[in-house]
Amino acid sequence: MKAGYFITGTDTGVGKTIVTSAILRSFIKKGLKVGAMKVIETGCLNKDGILLPSDGMLLRDMAEMNDSLDLITPIKLENPLSPLVASRIEEIEVDIERIFRAFETLQKKYDYLLVEGVGGLMVPLNKEEKKKSMFYFVRDLIKDMGLPVILVTRPTLGTINHTLLTLEALKNKKISVKGYIINFSEPAKNDIAEKTNPQVLKELVDVPCLGILPYLTELNKDKIGETAIKNFDIEALISL
């Protein structure tokens, strides 16, 4: 059985890569064969004309993959902007078919494939110039891949609105949602919002909370895996 998830977030910088890394390490600790993709990465480091995707490189390391970065991150852009804007500036096509070729290749190799998106659901990826106003968004990519979603959200003020809006946008496209994970991308403030938001979200949404990831001070493989197993509903994640 080939299975997997699409990891998206309520916004840019919410911690999708860290959460994806945590799930990867927990699956590996359970003895599962798991791979990862960062389908598009902007803000890549240009080293002697070669674009290096830091998120894609981290995921390859966390998953202990020996696959090419061209498979793990098939679209790499230098400017830290939305793919649509960055690709126009750099005059590089965001080739959706290229993403799917890489996706299908990796799916055949792994029992589970974790696919991390870019930004939030409504980040534009490209536009078919022959079709008036025909934009292709992250949400369309998720729909076409057919993977259930794990939503990464924040514990901080504003997360209730962002989480509900994102879940509503997924529902409108009839995209399956496995659940959400609350990620502390910064040290806990222990304010009222952080203390109350997790429970309020549980009351408001009809998909389960799969865990709360505390702030990680270091990206140590063993530490991330242990933290994930301790804080995530691993059995629910493994069971599609």
Curated annotation (Swiss-Prot):
Stored NCBIfam families: bioD
Primary gene name: bioD
Keywords noted in UniProt: ATP-binding, Biotin biosynthesis, Cytoplasm, Ligase, Magnesium, Metal-binding, Nucleotide-binding
Name recorded for this polypeptide: ATP-dependent dethiobiotin synthetase BioD
Known catalytic reactions: (7R,8S)-7,8-diammoniononanoate + CO2 + ATP = (4R,5S)-dethiobiotin + ADP + phosphate + 3 H(+)
Family (UniProt): Belongs to the dethiobiotin synthetase family.
Known function: Catalyzes a mechanistically unusual reaction, the ATP-dependent insertion of CO2 between the N7 and N8 nitrogen atoms of 7,8-diaminopelargonic acid (DAPA, also called 7,8-diammoniononanoate) to form a ureido ring.
Active site: 38
Binding site for substrate: 42
Organism of this sequence: Thermodesulfovibrio yellowstonii (strain ATCC 51303 / DSM 11347 / YP87)
